[in-house]
Amino acid sequence: MSQNLPPVDEARLAAEWEADRQVLANLAANGDVARIARPVDVSFRGSEQDFERVLIIASQFGFVELDREEDEDGDLFLFLECVQPVDEQSIRALTRKCLQIEMMCGVEYDGWGCEAQTGGVH
């Protein structure tokens, strides 16, 4: 099953990219090698009903469910994971996909994160 993905507002994408650049700069400062694929988590705020739709769509892009949490204000968060590099092109594509999922499912994309990968052996 393939989805017709909605176009993303370029101003919103640019705003997200500013936040993404800060995350990438922090990773680089910690010795990250961006081309190394690793688990990357993304989160969405919404309702349990919305999350079921998110899972159906996101699974088509290789995301798996990590966790669901409720914060102190009662907001529900869904955490998903995929494995990918974190170079600029990969993160721009990830953010675009997440914003499209946000639009299709009525949830709020809350960002992404990962651990720095230096290429060293532990």
Region roles according to the model:
Residues 1-122:
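Long, contiguous binding/interaction regions
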